[in-house]
Curated annotation (Swiss-Prot):
One of its GO terms (molecular function) is L-methionine-(S)-S-oxide reductase activity. Has an important function as a repair enzyme for proteins that have been inactivated by oxidation. Catalyzes the reversible oxidation-reduction of methionine sulfoxide in proteins to methionine. One of its GO terms (cellular component) is cytoplasm. It comes from Clostridium botulinum (strain Okra / Type B1). SUPFAM superfamilies: Peptide methionine sulfoxide reductase. This is Peptide methionine sulfoxide reductase MsrA. The gene is msrA. It comes from the Bacteria. It catalyses: L-methionyl-[protein] + [thioredoxin]-disulfide + H2O = L-methionyl-(S)-S-oxide-[protein] + [thioredoxin]-dithiol; [thioredoxin]-disulfide + L-methionine + H2O = L-methionine (S)-S-oxide + [thioredoxin]-dithiol. Disulfide bonds: none annotated. Pfam families: PMSR.
Amino acid sequence: MKEIVLAGGCFWGVEEYMSRIKGIVETKVGYANGIKENPSYEEVCSGTTGHAEACYIKYDESIISLEELLNKFWSIIDPTVLNKQGNDRGTQYRTGIFYLDQKDLNVIIKSKSQEQKNYRKPIVTEVEPLKCFYEAEEYHQKYLKKNPGGYCHIHLD
């Protein structure tokens, strides 16, 4: 099994979208690559902790490759917009690919480079090693499964 953490705006939609993909075996939402240890949702929303709302993904690479997974990720975000996805604004809504395995970096860079060909503006999606990931509060986990029709900036149909 492989792992990656993806930030694509509000984590509810990213988790719901990713959880529907064959080969993804586990998802969790949380706060990635900030400066405060174990922040609350309210603290992250204040914009002072440096965290991105993100989705931890465990996947079976014999079913879905990292390249395929990233192609799906690119399809649900606007990677040229800084600190905004859909109606959500703030540093916590930035886009990012946070890797746990250094060996994944070449695939990520190649994927980002390929995706850049689809845009005139530069892609601003962060590509960094995962420095920290704090699981979000329970009510955020599988939020759109528990609350069908809840807010989502991603078209899930």
